[in-house]
Amino acid sequence: MIITIGGRSGAGKTSVAHTLARRLGYRFYSMGDLRGRMAMERGITIDELNEIGKKESWTDKEVDEFQKKLGKKEDRFIIEGWLSFYFIPHSFKVFLDVNSEAAAKRIFKNQRPDEEPQESAREVLKMVKKRMAESQKRYRKYYGVDCFCEECYDLVINTTNLTISQVVSKIITELKIWKSKNKTRQEKRRKKK
């Protein structure tokens, strides 16, 4: 079983994915962290890496290939990333949403080392909106996919007023239902053959 977690910045994707992985005993991968390491290894910020990505596809392709291979080779893991649902289509796909104000406060409180430091939640919100719009445009250009299209996911949760534990519990409950439905579909396909 593979679970992919996407969604809006500040929705708690990494925290939820990490907690869920611990609860299920699964491995955890973060594509945001991987891109952040790529940027830091080159002595630049994630936003500078994204700026390069507007003209050079290698900034995305390396991470994207990693996800594709992972989805083919491994099982029992949770992967957090904006395009993970796309590169691992047989996964249980979760989208985490959040309102802008809550997202800005969360991100401001937990600023990342691969990002330019921000002085206020308002600055964070401006930076996040810009990054999300640029990433969305880049992914449409390279793959023709909208990473924020909720219809692409099996489960959508608004995390604005929920704790990490509440979100994880909802995912586990819905995962059981999804697995049951998929098992029934697979059995029907086998009978038709």
What annotation goes with each model-predicted range?
Residues 5:
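Hydrophobic anchor at the beta1->P-loop junction of P-loop NTPases
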Residues 8:
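P-loop (Walker A) phosphate-binding loop of NTP-binding proteins
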Residues 13:
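Conserved lysine of the Walker
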Residues 16:
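Hydrophobic positions on the alpha1 helix immediately C-terminal to the Walker A/P-loop
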Residues 22-29:
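Post-Walker A helix-loop "phosphate-sensing" segment adjacent to the P-loop in P-loop NTPases
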Residues 31-88, 101-104, 109-116, 126, ...:
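ATP-dependent small-molecule kinase phosphotransfer cores
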Residues 116-170:
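Small-molecule kinase domains that catalyze NTP-dependent phosphoryl transfer to phosphate-bearing small molecules
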Residues 137-138, 154-156, 166-193:
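C-terminal accessory "lid"/substrate-recognition subdomains
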